[in-house]
Amino acid sequence: MREFMNYITNAFYGATGWNEDNKYNELNATSRELIDFPLPRGLRLTLSSLATPHFATSYQLGSVGVVDGSISYLHSSIPLTHIAAQSDKIPLPALLRCYRRLHDLRSPGQQHYILDADPLSGLPPPPQSARALLGAASDAAVAGGALDGGNTDQDLGIYTHSLLYGRLYLPKSLLEGMIIKRFTQALQVQVRAVSEQSLRNGGTILGLVQYDKGKYGLEGLYSTDGGLLGFRGLYNFGGDASSSTCDPWTPTPGENNNNNNNNNNNNNGNAQAGEKERIYGRFSVGGELYYGTLNKSGGMSLGARFATLPAHRGTPLTATLTINPLMGNINATYALLAREYCSLATRVDFNVYSYESEWAVGMELWSNRRPAGFLLGASPSNDFEPEPHPPRKKERSFQAKMEWRLDDPEPEPEPQPTPKTRKNDEYKGVLKARLDNNLRMGLLWEGRAKSLIFSIGTGIDLHKLGEPFRSLGLEVQYSS
């Protein structure tokens, strides 16, 4: 389960138009969330609130042997008015879904909308005006062409927003903070810090400089822990990356190219469009280099990913391959959205030096049933009336035929109640499971009860059937 502050931070990225998917460290994000999802330990309660469009708070209390907790505060310079903050209104897929579909790449002059209209995300479609997303302060930017590709960085500075976040852990008195500052449409800087007595020099600071041009993304980092210097990069090609001027809110060339062909080429156009829809996706290749200035050691890795795009009409899938040539590790993952309610993922690790290998599989299964009904196979609690059959055409009566006339008009039927329809957020919960080569299993059920979002899970070791349960926990969140 994503924490409320992570949900708000993602909303900040969406409001400012920053694409978190276009980074090298997010290459394996889909399979990682489907397989390595965290399991709750003990009992943990979280109370959160988006008090104003600019300010959010969160209080957490947990018990794992000892009672601990944390206090969090977040401030955003841009009003976050386009999201649902109440726990009874937050779309569950936006908070719990693990399969992450890539967002469309935007050209340098276009406004980004990360909270897209993907039906699988559970999020509302992008607003029709910049006022609905950026507030009244963006009217001048709209007049200057913010949505038409004009240069508005100097006009109003809508891309120069910032986010401040702080969290205090009790009773350890550990303090962490984060500052996100957007300088231009393509440049963003993050500074993260942790202060704790047990750490070297009493704490550590991590600085990130991120540069995103859509077709490629670069990232430089420095950490005071070991004097680590690093550089990461990701380059995209194929799909929407092949055209830097592709408008994400207009049909892709593979969908409507037949409208520009003459009648003699309709068949060829349909075949080409169908072929493009069948394999329409984006390739990404990248790598990272890092060096520790204190311990005089370094490392590197290379990676590649293919993922289908939202315009793809077939089965959404993501495949990745990463290699660490110095350590000899090869990692391959494959994830797909088998159905709208079912996602599957698998991962294989192999070391060319030791010949050791590991594998793991994971899945998430969404349901519109309560937990008990889901496990017992009961019918869903939402009863949807079947669609009425179309009325049959009534023949003329015998009397009307004898008198060579039409039947008298029938009285208007009484209005019938509108049948129930499925809501956008029809799911009541999701079951997540994973299994690795050591026969360690993780089970997690996440859902909503009234205004509470809960997560209950356990870790099971099948090698120790006498004491199989390794962990058990319950986490409850409430936000207003």
From Swiss-Prot:
| InterPro entries membership | Mdm10
Q: Which family does it belong to?
A: Belongs to the MDM10 family.
Composition-biased stretches, type Basic and acidic residues, lie in 386-408
Gene encoding it? mdm10
GO BP terms: namely: establishment of mitochondrion localization; mitochondrial genome maintenance; mitochondrial outer membrane translocase complex assembly; mitochondrion-endoplasmic reticulum membrane tethering; phospholipid transport; protein insertion into mitochondrial outer membrane
Low complexity composition bias: residue spans:
256-270
How is the quaternary structure described?
Answer: Component of the ER-mitochondria encounter structure (ERMES) or MDM complex, composed of mmm-1, mdm10, mdm12 and mdm34. Associates with the mitochondrial outer membrane sorting assembly machinery SAM(core) complex.
The record's listing under Pfam families reads: MDM10
Localization (cell): Mitochondrion outer membrane
Classification from the root reads: Eukaryota, Fungi, Dikarya, Ascomycota, Pezizomycotina
Q: Where is this region: Disordered?
A: 245-272, 377-429
Source species of the chain: Neurospora crassa (strain ATCC 24698 / 74-OR23-1A / CBS 708.71 / DSM 1257 / FGSC 987)
Function, in words: Component of the ERMES/MDM complex, which serves as a molecular tether to connect the endoplasmic reticulum and mitochondria. Components of this complex are involved in the control of mitochondrial shape and protein biogenesis and may function in phospholipid exchange. mdm10 is involved in the late assembly steps of the general translocase of the mitochondrial outer membrane (TOM complex). Functions in the tom40-specific route of the assembly of outer membrane beta-barrel proteins, including the association of tom40 with the receptor tom22 and small TOM proteins.
Q: What is this protein called?
A: Mitochondrial distribution and morphology protein 10
Instruction: Tell me what topology the record assigns in the membrane.
Output: Multi-pass membrane protein
Record remark on domains: Lacks alpha-helical transmembrane segments, suggesting that it resides in the membrane via beta-sheet conformations similar to those predicted for other outer membrane proteins and porin.
